[in-house]
Amino acid sequence: MSKSSKDLLEFWEDQMKLSHTSSNYFFRKSPSHYHMMLIVMNSYKLNENLSVEELKTRLFKTSRPKSALMIKEACDKDFFYLEKTGNDHRKKYVLPTQNFINEFNEYLKTLKNLSF
């Protein structure tokens, strides 16, 4: 097995060990969960406001009720939180929690260090 393949395998096995103690399990439940994580983190990194309604619309192949449930679960598990800003208090924005931001950045740093 090549070194890069071995590194990737070790990385994956380490991630699976964390699966029940971190966001790994939640965001790997389905492609839609992973897609939701990427949308929220991309908006956060670009400093863009992402409303709950916009997130529901952008999650392809996921019904609006299922999208709402996924967002609620992510908030309940303290990965995301909802914030009301501006004059329209009916509009809620989805933001990652600081703990999740730290976890996500650590995940990206580890991925970048893998050589292929």
Please place each PLM-identified region on the residue numbering.
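Short amphipathic alpha-helical interaction segments
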Residues: 61-76
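Short helix-to-turn junction characteristic of helix-turn-helix DNA-binding domains
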Residues: 40-44
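Short alpha-helical segments that sit at the start of domains
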Residues: 8-39
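Amphipathic alpha-helical dimerization/coiled-coil segments
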Residues: 19, 105-116
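General nucleic-acid-binding
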Residues: 1-7
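A short, conserved structural fragment
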Residues: 75-85
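Short acidic, hydrophobic short linear motifs in intrinsically disordered regions
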Residues: 46-58
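Short, cationic-aromatic polyanion-contact patches
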Residues: 85-108
